[in-house]
Structure formats: structure tokens, C-alpha cells
UniProtKB/Swiss-Prot annotation:
<feature type="binding site">
    <location>
        <begin position="58"/>
        <end position="61"/>
    </location>
    <ligand>
        <name>GTP</name>
    </ligand>
</feature>
<keyword id="KW-0342">GTP-binding</keyword>
<dbReference type="InterPro" id="IPR027417">
    <property type="entry name" value="P-loop_NTPase"/>
</dbReference>
<feature type="binding site">
    <location>
        <begin position="8"/>
        <end position="15"/>
    </location>
    <ligand>
        <name>ATP</name>
    </ligand>
</feature>
<protein>
    <recommendedName>
        <fullName>Nucleotide-binding protein TTE1834</fullName>
    </recommendedName>
</protein>
<comment type="similarity">
    <text>Belongs to the RapZ-like family.</text>
</comment>
<dbReference type="InterPro" id="IPR053930">
    <property type="entry name" value="RapZ-like_N"/>
</dbReference>
<dbReference type="Pfam" id="PF22740">
    <property type="entry name" value="PapZ_C"/>
</dbReference>
<dbReference type="InterPro" id="IPR053931">
    <property type="entry name" value="RapZ_C"/>
</dbReference>
<dbReference type="Pfam" id="PF03668">
    <property type="entry name" value="RapZ-like_N"/>
</dbReference>
<dbReference type="GO" id="GO:0005525">
    <property type="term" value="F:GTP binding"/>
</dbReference>
<keyword id="KW-0547">Nucleotide-binding</keyword>
<keyword id="KW-0067">ATP-binding</keyword>
<comment type="function">
    <text>Displays ATPase and GTPase activities.</text>
</comment>
<dbReference type="InterPro" id="IPR005337">
    <property type="entry name" value="RapZ-like"/>
</dbReference>
<dbReference type="GO" id="GO:0005524">
    <property type="term" value="F:ATP binding"/>
</dbReference>
Length: 284
């Protein structure tokens, strides 16, 4: 039985996450009151027909905090296993999402959206600390979020339970704050100075071929892959559920994208749970 609670910041993708879980065969309920968890758990753990349940929860309200903790205590006392997925995103991305949907943040009242986001982060900080998986959706599309959840909850992956998130970025836009490991690939020849490659990105085959034709690129990728594979079991041993590997070049469009994709392919081929995203590929 997999009993999953999905919560997090408003606008971080809870609805999309539940849709993804439903596609994976989970019985999903959105906006589920935490106080009813014990009854639902009793029902499903005794059922032979349902073995995967995902509950979407809004935990902003004061009473909900008391309810969720008492309900989690009930699950522990009855040896009911559960997992918590916490979704979050950067302030900038959340503000953009609220503006695009023309929705008001539930905690902003008449104030600014960012004030509501800050208040919600404070209220949810404790539940975030006990989450099994924390997923930053700032740079994830719906399909990438689905892939990340699939890597966690579908069987057959090496070191199931840890997600390897490979990210490319441009140093001119800053190092990703969420990165656990950062690697600088500005030592590689830059496709930017090749006229026909400048308007392309590392997702294009011509740029990929240019970057990976250099011996130093091939050797770097091999050594990087070996190091990551060496480290993963130790991160798992320490209870880490997500490893964010950031690959940086000057603008985040050519070298870092090509190397991030190559690292993703290398790890994916060996059946690790891995996703890739390119933070700055659309920047000018």
C-alpha cells in the first residue's frame, strides 16, 4: 500500500501532480480534510482493491495544522506507512503563475501576492521539514513534473526514493540556490563564437556535436558520471530524497545544456531516477 499526501505552496502544481498520480494508477482525492485521514487510512488499508492512494491537501489553515499532525500520529501508531510530497517554487515563478491565471493568492487578502507567498512559506515550514520529497517546480513543465513523480513512485528504478535533478544554468544569471553540486563547464570551447551555432542551443544536434567532439568534454562527462554514481548510495544512506546537480556556462544556452543533456542520458541509460531542465535557455 502506498499512501501519499501531496501538499505545498499555492500555485506550485498540486493539481498537476494529482493528475500525474492518477495517470500512474493512484486513487486520488483533492482538497482532502486532514482530520479524515484516520478513517480513510483504515478503509484503504483493509481494502484489497486499492493499493495506491494520493491525497491533495491545503494545509494553510490554523485548524488543519493540528489535524494533520494528530492524523500523522495515528498513522504511525497503527503502522500505516505514508509519504509526503511537498511542492514549492520561487517567488518570481509563483507570482507569474498567479498573474497569468488572474487568481488572488489565498493569503494575500487585499495585499500583494508576494506577501501571501511569504506568509504561506512561514505557515508550511514545519510540514516541509518532515516531507519525504521536496520538488521545486520553478523550471518544470507538467510533463517533467509527471516524470519526476514517476521516478519516485513507479517501481524498477535504481535507488528508488532519490531523484537526480540535472539542471543547466548561466553564470550571468546566478548560481541556482537549490543546487547541491555545481560544476563549471566554461573551460570547454564556446559554440557562441561560431556564427552558425550562436542562435542555436545545446538541445540542437549541431551544438551537441560541437561540444562533445572535444576530448576534454568526453573525459569530463565520464569522470562526472563516475563521481555521481559513487556519491548516490551515500546520499541515499543519509536520507536525501533529491539531488540537484547544476551545470553552468556563461549564458546557460550552449555548453551547459549539452553537458546536462549528456549527463541525463548517461544516468537514464543506467536506470537512475533522473530529470533534466534548462533554467536559462530562454534568456537573451
Amino acid at each position: 500500500m502506498r499512501f501519499v499526501i501531496i501538499t505545498g505552496l499555492s500555485g506550485a502544481g498540486k493539481t498537476q501532480a494529482l493528475k500525474a498520480m492518477e495517470d500512474m494508477g493512484f486513487f486520488c482525492i483533492d482538497n482532502f480534510p486532514p482530520a479524515l485521514i484516520p478513517k480513510l487510512a483504515d478503509l484503504f488499508y483493509q481494502s484489497k482493491n486499492i493499493d495506491k492512494v494520493a491525497l491533495g491537501m491545503d494545509l494553510r489553515g490554523g485548524q488543519f495544522f493540528e489535524d494533520i499532525y494528530s492524523s500523522l500520529d495515528f498513522l504511525k501508531k497503527n503502522n500505516y506507512d505514508y509519504e509526503i510530497v511537498f511542492l514549492e517554487a520561487s517567488d518570481e515563478v509563483l507570482i507569474k503563475r498567479f498573474k497569468e491565471t488572474r487568481r488572488r493568492h489565498p493569503l494575500s487578502e487585499e495585499g500583494r501576492i508576494v506577501d501571501g507567498i511569504n506568509e504561506e512559506r512561514k505557515r508550511l515550514s514545519d510540514i516541509r521539514k518532515i516531507a519525504n520529497y521536496i520538488i521545486d517546480t520553478s523550471n518544470l513543465t507538467s510533463s517533467q513534473l509527471k516524470e519526476e513523480l514517476s521516478n519516485i513512485f513507479l517501481k524498477g528504478k535504481k535507488f528508488k526514493g532519490i531523484i537526480i535533478d540535472v539542471m543547466s544554468f548561466g553564470y550571468k544569471y546566478g548560481i541556482p540556490l537549490e543546487a547541491d553540486l555545481v560544476f563549471d563547464v566554461r573551460f570547454l570551447p564556446n559554440p557562441f563564437y561560431i556564427d552558425e551555432l550562436r542562435p542555436l542551443t545545446g538541445n540542437d544536434e549541431k551544438v551537441k556535436e560541437y561540444v562533445m567532439k572535444w576530448e576534454e568534454a568526453k573525459e569530463f562527462l565520464k569522470k562526472l558520471g563516475d563521481m555521481i554514481k559513487f556519491l548516490i548510495p551515500y546520499y541515499v544512506r543519509e536520507g536525501k530524497s533529491q539531488l540537484v546537480i547544476a551545470i553552468g556556462c556563461t549564458g546557460g544556452k550552449h555548453r551547459s545544456v549539452a553537458i546536462a543533456n549528456a549527463l541525463y542520458d548517461l544516468l537514464k541509460k543506467e536506470d537512475y531516477s533522473v530529470v533534466v531542465n534548462h533554467r536559462d535557455i530562454g534568456e537573451e
